[in-house]
């Protein structure tokens, strides 16, 4: 992908001799939405750290567009309840940000009403929008969103997915999004990558938003959601390692003579 914002080539990371990521190929282009899914312990957080430049891979390479501006939205933040920190002061921790810039970013995500609120008092959905506004303050070419809809109900997920799509359209930025849901993803996703230490499979989410049964289940939210069908050609054991074809895996249903 010649116009990629970021490209990972055969990236591998090991901790204490144990492979956490193995032979990862991944690229994100301007205007493209890539959703990364996988079970707990699959290496999603490690991959994000490599993308952000917080971790140097032991193998392979990470190429970034020169002077690439990245906006990062973490899963969550912990703020001491006794710390006198308003949303405005939190956003102004980003260098060069004044009240006007903070207000503009909050307006873009629909959260301008909380600008003077103590950050500890805002709702979970409002916090997600504040974190997204903070990511936008860098005028990013690439948005990295770590489980942006975690802990949000289906209606809230739909609103956030629609917002992310509008931001992509408005700014033309690429989006790398980590999702905790293995099957239900944002319908605007261009590519889904299933990770479990290595890339198990990848492809486009299936557009099922017009299916009557899907619409009945999710109502007006159906248009923002899509189902991703995995097409693995292998299985993993409980530790994440690939099981060799024909190998026996011990479990509760084993019968030994």
Swiss-Prot record:
Record's GO cellular component terms: plasma membrane
Database matches in InterPro entries: AAA+_ATPase (IPR003593), ABC_transporter-like_ATP-bd (IPR003439), ABC_transporter-like_CS (IPR017871), Metal_Ion_Import_ABC (IPR050153), P-loop_NTPase (IPR027417)
Domain named ABC transporter: residues: 6-221
Cell membrane among keywords: yes
Record keywords, A-Z: ATP-binding, Cell inner membrane, Cell membrane, Ion transport, Membrane, Nucleotide-binding, Translocase, Transport, Zinc, Zinc transport
Membrane topology type: Peripheral membrane protein
Subcellular location: Cell inner membrane
EC nos: 7.2.2.20
Classification via Pfam families: ABC_tran (PF00005)
Domain of life: Bacteria
Any single biological process term in GO: response to zinc ion
Catalytic activities: Zn(2+)(out) + ATP(in) + H2O(in) = Zn(2+)(in) + ADP(in) + phosphate(in) + H(+)(in)
Principal location class: membrane
Binding site for ATP: 38-45
GO MF: ABC-type zinc transporter activity; ATP binding; ATP hydrolysis activity
Function recorded in the entry: Part of the ABC transporter complex ZnuABC involved in zinc import. Responsible for energy coupling to the transport system.
Family indicated by similarity: Belongs to the ABC transporter superfamily. Zinc importer (TC 3.A.1.15.5) family.
Subunit annotation: The complex is composed of two ATP-binding proteins (ZnuC), two transmembrane proteins (ZnuB) and a solute-binding protein (ZnuA).
NCBIfam families from the UniProt entry: PRK09544.1 (NF007090)
Protein name: Zinc import ATP-binding protein ZnuC
Species the sequence originates in: Pseudomonas entomophila (strain L48)
């Amino acid at each position: 992908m010649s116009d990629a914002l970021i490209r990972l080539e055969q990236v591998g990371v090991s901790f204490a001799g144990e492979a956490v990521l193995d032979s990862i190929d991944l690229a994100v282009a301007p205007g493209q939405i890539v959703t990364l899914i996988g079970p707990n312990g699959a290496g999603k957080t490690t991959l994000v750290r490599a993308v952000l430049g917080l971790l140097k891979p032991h193998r392979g390479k990470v190429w970034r567009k020169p002077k690439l501006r990245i906006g990062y939205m973490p899963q969550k933040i912990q703020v001491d309840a006794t710390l006198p920190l308003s949303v405005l002061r939190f956003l102004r921790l980003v260098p060069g940000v004044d009240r006007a810039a903070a207000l503009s970013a909050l307006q873009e995500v629909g959260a301008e009403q909380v600008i003077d609120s103590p950050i500890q008092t805002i709702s979970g959905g409002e916090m997600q929008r504040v974190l997204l506004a903070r990511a936008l303050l860098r005028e990013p070419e690439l948005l990295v969103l770590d489980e942006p809809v975690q802990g949000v109900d289906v209606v809230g997920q739909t609103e956030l997915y629609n917002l992310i799509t509008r931001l992509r359209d408005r700014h033309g930025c690429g989006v790398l999004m980590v999702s905790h849901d293995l099957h239900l993803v944002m319908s605007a996703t261009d590519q889904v990558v299933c990770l479990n230490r290595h890339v198990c499979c990848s492809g486009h989410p299936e557009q099922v938003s017009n299916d009557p049964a899907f619409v009945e289940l999710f109502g007006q939210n159906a248009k923002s959601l899509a189902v991703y069908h995995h097409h693995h050609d292998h299985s993993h054991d409980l530790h994440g390692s690939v099981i060799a074809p024909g190998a026996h895996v011990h479990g509760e249903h084993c019968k030994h003579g």
